[in-house]
From Swiss-Prot:
Function: Decreases host neutrophil chemotaxis induced by N-formylmethionine-leucyl-phenylalanine (fMLP). (Microbial infection) Interacts with the surface of Plasmodium berghei sporozoites. Enhances sporozoite gliding activity. Enhances host hepatocyte traversal by sporozoites.
Secretion signal span: 1-24
Keyword Electron transport attributed: no
UniProt protein name: Sporozoite-associated mosquito saliva protein 1
An example Gene Ontology CC term for this record: extracellular region
Keyword presence, Secreted: yes
Phylogenetic classification of the source organism: Eukaryota, Metazoa, Ecdysozoa, Arthropoda, Hexapoda
Cellular localization per UniProt: Secreted
Induction: (Microbial infection) Up-regulated in salivary gland following infection with P.berghei sporozoites.
GO terms classed as biological process: host-mediated perturbation of symbiont process
Gene3D superfamilies registered for this protein in UniProt: Ganglioside GM2 activator
Keyword vocabulary terms for this entry: Secreted, Signal
Leftover remarks: Active immunization or antiserum against the protein reduce P.berghei liver burden in mice after exposure to the infected mosquitoes. Individuals in malaria-endemic areas have higher levels of IgG recognizing the protein.
Length: 181
């Protein structure tokens, strides 16, 4: 999976979370989403219900209960900046529509798109996407990255659409398990 698609998948999972603490796989890592903010104002193209949740279970599976709404769009260029422990670690621009087209040929990406009900192509019609906790996705193959993810991260996402903008600010933290005792 290319790095742009990984960013999209990661943000998709994180954006669905809101103020939840979850014991993660691989010995009890904990993910805490302190806040998610829809920050483009009243005309925001895509919004996420602040009551949406994702639960990271001990068996390295994730399940979600979430609602996202869009007024529809034809284009979506995402600028994402991730700052970890106060230091910038990633700044990338991703053409979401191009990534959706590429994802259709990627079994892993297609599974995530299907699970979360994300449209698989642009243009995207006005819609509401809801997920429930009956579907799960395994993060088993990513658990070795938890040590690298450890610490506080601020994720700033700005998506420029043909009809306006979407903006999300996510404040999250990954803490390590207590290895002593």
């Amino acid at each position: 999976m290319n790095s742009s698609w990984r960013v999209v998948v990661f943000l998709g999972l994180v954006i669905l979370c809101h103020s939840r603490r979850a014991r993660a796989c691989n010995g009890g890592y904990e993910m805490i989403v302190h806040s998610i903010e829809n920050c483009a104002g009243e005309g925001q193209i895509v919004t996420i219900d602040p009551k949406s949740t994702v639960t990271l279970m001990e068996d390295c599976k994730v399940k979600s209960k979430a609602t996202a709404r869009t007024v529809g769009f034809k284009t979506a260029m995402m600028d994402v900046t991730i700052t970890k422990n106060g230091l910038p670690v990633l700044k990338e621009t991703v053409d979401i529509c191009a990534n959706l087209e590429e994802a259709s040929g990627n079994k892993e990406a297609a599974e995530i798109i299907t699970m979360f009900g994300v449209p698989d192509h642009c243009p995207v019609a006005a819609s509401e996407i809801r997920t429930d906790e009956s579907q799960t996705y395994s993060l088993e193959k990513y658990k070795q990255h938890l040590l690298v993810a450890q610490g506080r991260s601020i994720i700033d996402v700005l998506v420029k659409h043909d009809k306006g903008e979407s903006c999300f600010k996510i404040d999250m933290e990954v803490t390590s398990p207590n290895l002593i005792g």
